[in-house]
Amino acid sequence: EDRFSNIYDGFKAYPVTCTNDCYPASADIECESDMQNCQFVGNNPTVNSHTGFNVTWLGHASFLLNTASGEQILIDPVFGQFDWPVNWAFRLAEGFSRNEPAEVGEDKLAQTDAVVYSHIHYDHFNKADIAELGTKPEYLVPLGFAEHFPNRGYTIKEMAWYTSKSVGKTSIHFVPAHHFSNRIWVPYLYEDDNATLWGGWVFESEGKTLFFAGDTGYSPHF
């Protein structure tokens, strides 16, 4: 079976856990306990407010994007706890629960023109949220992604790297990232390593450009 791969393989080593090898200690981050309920306490840099985009952070890697030309786009929306079986495994192991972000109101969600996903990992794609988002927005997803949606009238556009789609007056381009994908692993029976593509997104509107890298390591693709 064909699987996807990074454009530039190179050396990559991903941490096994985030207990002690994920992030170095920093005076800018305070946690109640090891990696629990962490808050950024450092100085925020000055942000150029004339970017042409209005970006609202919804927690972790989820963003609500309003473009200069008036389109509303959700990026990697994950509103609640992670999908089964990850949420179940956390409870079974007495692990942590996700700090759920502030909810986006129904009226605001109803204005969404498109939803884009960078890859299929549980912290970026939550099946439980699809029913809430509904069939009104168009879904732009990496190759191999559509089969994870319910068969209920969703408008889904699977995209390869360096392909583009217009949503209203906003041009959206799918670009490479240096990462991997998987969602299901049953020892000796089934695995879906790199069965779906991954990447980042470039948004162009009214002469302005915004880049969402997705999950990525450094490589010449930048």
Please give the residue ranges for each predicted region:
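Active-site metal-binding motif and surrounding structural segment of the metallo-beta-lactamase
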Residues: 85-141, 147, 155
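Short acidic-hydrophobic surface loop/beta-edge motif
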Residues: 65, 161-169, 203
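Short, polar loop motifs at secondary-structure junctions
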Residues: 59-60, 141-148, 160-162
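Active-site regions of enzymes building and remodeling cell-envelope glycoconjugates
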Residues: 152-159, 171
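Metallo-beta-lactamase
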Residues: 1-114, 173-180, 193, 203-214
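Active-site-proximal loop/helix segments of hydrolase catalytic cores
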Residues: 128, 181-222
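Active-site environment of divalent metal-dependent phosphoester hydrolases
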Residues: 82, 120-125, 146-149, 163-166, ...
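Residue-level marker for the onset of beta-strands and adjacent loop->beta junctions
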Residues: 51-52, 61, 135, 161, ...
